[in-house]
Amino acid sequence: MARHLITSALPYINGIKHLGNMVGSMLPADVYSRYLRQRGHDVLYICATDEHGTPAELAAKERGLPVDEFCAQAHDAQKAVYDGFELAFDYFGRSSSEQNREITQHFARRLNENGFIEERAIRQVYSPADGRFLPDRYVEGTCPHCGYDKARGDQCENCTRVLDPTDLINPRSAISGSTDLEVRETKHLFLLQSKLQHEVEEWVARHEEEWPQLASSIARKWLNEGLHDRAITRDLDWGVPVPADTWPELAAEGKVFYVWFDAPIEYIGATKEWSDLDPENRDWKSWWYDADSGENPVRYTEFMAKDNVPFHTVMFPATELGVREPWKKVDYVKAFNWLTYYGGKFSTSQKRGVFTDHALEILPADYWRYFLIANAPESDDSSFTWEHFTATVNKDLADTLGNFVNRVLSFSKKRFGEEVPAGAPAGESETKLGEEIAALLAEYESHMETLQFRKAAAALRALWSAGNSYLEEKAPWLEIKTNPEGAALTLRTAMNLIHLYSVVSEPFIPASSKAMRSAFALSEDTATWVTQDEAKSLDSVPAGTPFTVPPVLFAKITDEDLESYKERFGGAPE
């Protein structure tokens, strides 16, 4: 059986992330990881904060902190939010770790030995006002391709084109805002991607048919435009230093590796961080080195937003290929479009949009987890609106699932006491229901296996709806007047549906799923996946099992709540 290695694109260290960041990489990876674990697979889910480069230095400067101290605090703050969202990382590391430094420097040495790194003198932007060379992200200006006036010197976030700072129109310093910029000569290391173009093309060709269209089209676009040699070092104070044993002159000048060189390597570095915590029982290399062979090969799935696709499908594979060592390369790239806020961008400065820490202040994580996955921007951009969020939570979670659980358990307790009633043997309605549930479960599983999250959410919702339809058809509140045994059967069947829901809903809404399972006094709280036979029989909770009525799973969002959220976070543009 394959082992599953799963990574999310590393969140930048420079602040708490918004809902778009959450649904674009971390949340779907967590949903998929949870599902695979429930199915009995060996799963390793790795993520980390991306701590090097311009964002870290700028954010630390704004806070008046040394950059290492800022990163330590920001890492802990992000980790607390992700814990609140119940993201079940096996390990959440830091790209500033010693492990990442060692592996990044190893990669650089190997690339150099194999003839894929070259030292070049280049002309780079220098700011007299700041007294320093300005790395890519320190330069802002207008994109020459799309005209976006807040493009950075490394990439335009509007059109996703990769840039050099000298490409920008009307460039300015991101530190001081000064437009008095000069171009001076400095030396840097270049990764000779042009020499690896053919190998990367062959590698992409072997995988792109399996990838979603979004990922494969971006990778192919980059390859068609040709891979260019790119500088992989920067003039920064914070980063993985260039090793002095290989490049003594550059090391003496304080050069560090470009953040997009060391950040993907941190997937490996974080795995070693995890392994080093328990080296007798964890083997990081078995997940990354020569991991395609043996009885339990690794299948590697990456999750990211579309702006990260070029780096993961072209640049990092080129690095791995050039090292000439059997490092594991990605098998499946799950890419996402943008989640917008009323059709526009999330903005911290303009106080527009919901950031993850604030989201947890007003509502439990399961509300957000379900809505975001059910509306994940898979085939196109999707828009968050408070009206849509409220309607989804109230209809799907409060009415369809939460109300079903409360109605069944409350009514059964009132009429039959605090144990699951026995009632009559299963009849035609129960047989029909079991077949319907098994079919819907198979559909749900199919979508989860192929990482189609919106479709999986729709199938999960259909499972919940099937229970409501069964309850309305049988109407135990009427049935009990003339056929108490039949009413008991209906409630016993419905309680088994609740337990089934608690298992299959676990990837989406883990806290609520646990609350549903905890309602039944079973021997253990098991979330082991439901088989087709178990789905058909609906008898995992036997008659006589004690149960309790849990607190309301999902409180409805009122009109007053809706207006207060829009006032706090901003609503539709006027």
From Swiss-Prot:
The keyword Aminoacyl-tRNA synthetase applies. Its EC number is 6.1.1.10. It is found in: Cytoplasm. Keywords: Aminoacyl-tRNA synthetase, ATP-binding, Cytoplasm, Ligase, Metal-binding, Nucleotide-binding, Protein biosynthesis, Zinc. SUPFAM superfamilies: Anticodon-binding domain of a subclass of class I aminoacyl-tRNA synthetases (SSF47323), Methionyl-tRNA synthetase (MetRS), Zn-domain (SSF57770), Nucleotidylyl transferase (SSF52374). Binds 1 zinc ion per subunit. ATP binds at T348. It is an enzyme of class 6 (ligase). Pfam families: Anticodon_3, tRNA-synt_1g. It catalyses: tRNA(Met) + L-methionine + ATP = L-methionyl-tRNA(Met) + AMP + diphosphate. A motif ('HIGH' region) lies at residues 11-21. It comes from the Bacteria. The keyword Repeat does not apply. One of its GO terms (biological process) is methionyl-tRNA aminoacylation. Its cofactor is Zn(2+). GO terms for cellular component: aminoacyl-tRNA synthetase multienzyme complex; cytosol. Monomer. Is required not only for elongation of protein synthesis but also for the initiation of all mRNA translation through initiator tRNA(fMet) aminoacylation. Belongs to the class-I aminoacyl-tRNA synthetase family. MetG type 1 subfamily. This is Methionine--tRNA ligase.
